[in-house]
Amino acid sequence: MATIADSLHTGREMQHADPRAVLTGTHFMNGDAAACEGALAAGARFGAGYPITPSTEIVERFAARAPQVGGLFIQMEDELAASITLQGMVWAGQKAFTSTSGPGFSLMMEHIVYAAMTETPCVFFNVQRGGPSTGLPTLPAQGDMMQARFGSHGDYSLIALVPNSPQECFWLAVKAFNLAEQFRVPVMVMMDECVGHMTEKVVIPKAEEIEIFPRRSPSKKPGEFLAYGEIGEDLVPEMASAGEGYKIYVTGMTHDKRGYPLGNADAQRTLITRLFEKISRAEDELTLIDEDHMDDADVAVVSYGITSRVAERAIQLARAKGLKVGRMRLKGVWPFPEKRFREVAQRIKAFVAPELNMGQVVLEVERCAGGHCRTIAMPHPGGTVHRPLDILAAIEKGARA
């Protein structure tokens, strides 16, 4: 994968990564470290965080690496402070992120939706662990998938990516920052403990092979520019930075093109509709599925993160037995690729959906199937992973549907 720019079709001139920040070469590193390197390559120069297992290694590495490229890390007093501090730095012109896990992710919900409402481009890494509450701090789960999309109050839309390897942690970190800038939304990178802590080969290319989506700088002079007034065909406004002479008003209240609060239904309808449509219009672009053997499939295995690696073995075993089974590995979960799943549901017998939770993304799969095919959930409370033979049994069940 030499570039992640293929899906960025907005007509804006792409930039390249800063060579000072890119550790070009072949490395042996874990997913947390690779995510940090992806953030640096994407241009992140500010990180804020609070230590929490199993995500601590992301900010620990960033704290050491950022000063080498003119960046800064601040360990905050808690996740609340971290998740709002990074947004201040974004409005000051920086690319910024935080990282956390379950309990910290819960604390960040208010500020995630604040970023969605104010259209603040930023990235949240969530290295999921067993829950609820304190749960299993050192063991894997995928129980925060619905929380990533619906965890806060009100109506909003955002993007969530799901890597399944350290190599993909690097590339999806880069992509997360690009998508955050392209759509002016918070982007979640939903890792899990296994992916975050597994150590594998990670190939980092040269800086000129890493394309970066630039900040949408104002096209008008100070005095003429409106904070949310210069909106392109993609429904995403230009963004001014504090300290550049522009008048910027940022509020979590329903607001107009100036950013000023407006307390009426018309303003609410205009704003919320645009926040949704800037994502929904890009459904094809944001459909990120790694598919294999889907041309002749009777059964499609839907998985993501560490579970997809276990599922791959089950698919191999099934095809060796002559079963027509394909892979639909989600690299992007939100927005959910509804169009593609509705298409597939028309021609297969069953979806099989293993997850390290009690059934979350499978609900979207079942909704999109619309009764055209069977949906077989494979819930798992976490702490370990599925057995390939159990997934194989579910595939065989689906093939008999």
Where do the PLM segments sit?
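Short loop/turn motifs at secondary-structure junctions
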Residues: G43, Y156-S157, K324, R347
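Structural motif
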Residues: F97-S99, V123-F125, A160-V162, M188-M190, ...
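Structural signal for short hydrophobic segments within the conserved structured cores
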Residues: I74, L158-L161, G326, I376
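Thiamine diphosphate
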Residues: M1-F150, S157, V174, E193, ...
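Flexible loop/turn segments at secondary-structure boundaries
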Residues: P54-E57, S83, F105-L107, G131-T134, ...
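Internal, well-ordered domain-core segments that constitute the primary functional module
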Residues: M146-M190
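Flexible, low-complexity linker and terminal segments
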Residues: A2-G31, E181-A401
